[in-house]
């Protein structure tokens, strides 16, 4: 029950974002999720783990296809044994999301097997669709928001160096692409589920080139970052350490008291989220900022309870929300009331939705 409640809250939160995000296109937004109950241990048999996940995904996707109106010979056909209370509505498409990013071809195969009228236009992306990571479309859209925020502050992030902290790593779509959209990004700290990256005084040019190298390196992590390019006092540290040493340089850039010489990883991440930098770039998964009046239980992301901070504690001047649900809505309001500049996730990362809609429409036209 506990796990189910967590996923239920997460899906409902994503539904809210998706419905607003879909205002840029015609179809309304929806969201779904599934939790496999009998997954093998991936550390023991990764192939079996993936096969079970795909089998569950096939069940999950097949269900709405079976229940949705179809078009046959230009006429709407209602599925047998279905009692419906709405009008004809054969339009149903799916898009890759958390945990299913590489499953578009599987979904399209189901669509074709079931005779769904959209065929391989059913699931955007995949081998016959737009490659969102290759295009960098989600990050590019969010970066337009970032540029606007900087412009309102009288700065140009495309021609002037600026400091940044981030959530994610260079192997990721949104984080990786986002950290390559300006040659003037000085990434001073970042973290993912494995490592904490610290580079208190990075050279904008050489650090950009190194991030670009990691972006194209298969399955890269922060541990692959060339240590010789990290500025004095920085480094890459596993989150499994009991404590991480803090140099004077790191303390200075993150706004940590001089008396603090080391911190446990979770407390260091707290400091990164509150760093007095120009940009906070969220390209990760999870909810890291809430409002003072909200409890961690209300947020519904138990995995990050130990990391989460309040909106009023965030000292970055600008926030770019490449990832979904990185902040609660009340957390955004609290941050904005302190003078911070941000939009919302459904504004910043809506470009991917628009791209998928274009893809479906083009395929319908060609078919």
Regions found by a protein language model. Name each.
Residues 10-14, 20-22:
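N-terminal amphipathic, basic-rich helices that act as targeting or association modules
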Residues 31:
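Duplex nucleic acid-engaging cores and interfaces of nucleic-acid transaction enzymes
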Residues 42-43, 53-54, 58, 65-87, ...:
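Non-transmembrane, aqueous-exposed alpha-helical and coiled segments at domain scale
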């Amino acid at each position: 029950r506990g796990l189910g409640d967590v996923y239920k809250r997460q899906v409902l939160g994503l539904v809210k974002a998706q419905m607003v995000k879909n205002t840029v296109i015609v179809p309304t937004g929806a969201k779904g999720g599934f939790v496999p109950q009998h997954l093998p241990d991936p550390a023991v048999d990764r192939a079996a783990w993936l096969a079970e996940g795909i089998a569950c995904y096939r069940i999950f996707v097949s269900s709405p296809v079976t229940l949705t109106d179809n078009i046959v010979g230009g006429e709407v056909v209602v599925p047998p044994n279905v009692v419906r209370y709405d009008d004809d509505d054969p339009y149903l498409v799916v898009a890759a999301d958390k945990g299913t990013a590489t499953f578009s071809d599987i979904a399209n195969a189901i669509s074709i097997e079931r005779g769904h009228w959209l065929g391989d236009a059913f699931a955007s992306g995949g081998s016959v669709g737009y490659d969102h990571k290759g295009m960098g479309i989600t990050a590019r859209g969010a970066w337009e928001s970032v540029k606007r925020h900087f412009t309102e502050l009288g700065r140009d992030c495309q021609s002037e160096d600026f400091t940044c902290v981030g959530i994610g790593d260079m192997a990721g779509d949104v984080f990786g692409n986002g950290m390559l959209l300006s040659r003037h990004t000085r990434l001073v700290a970042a973290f993912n589920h494995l490592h904490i990256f610290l580079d208190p005084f990075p050279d904008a040019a050489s650090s950009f080139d190194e991030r670009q190298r990691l972006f194209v390196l298969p399955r890269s992590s922060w541990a692959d970052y060339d240590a010789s390019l990290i500025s004095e006092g920085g480094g890459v540290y596993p989150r499994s350490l009991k404590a991480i040493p803090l140099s004077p340089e790191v303390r200075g850039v993150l706004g940590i008291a001089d008396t603090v010489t080391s911190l446990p990883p979770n407390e260091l991440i707290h400091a990164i989220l509150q760093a007095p930098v120009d940009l906070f770039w969220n390209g990760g998964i999870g909810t890291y900022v809430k409002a003072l009046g909200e409890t961690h239980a209300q947020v519904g992301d138990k995995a990050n309870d130990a990391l989460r901070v309040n909106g009023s504690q965030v000292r970055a001047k600008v926030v770019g929300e490449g990832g979904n649900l990185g902040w609660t809505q009340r957390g955004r309001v609290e941050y904005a009331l302190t003078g911070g500049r941000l939009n919302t996730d459904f504004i910043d990362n809506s470009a991917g939705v628009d791209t998928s809609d274009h893809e479906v429409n083009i395929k319908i036209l060609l078919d």
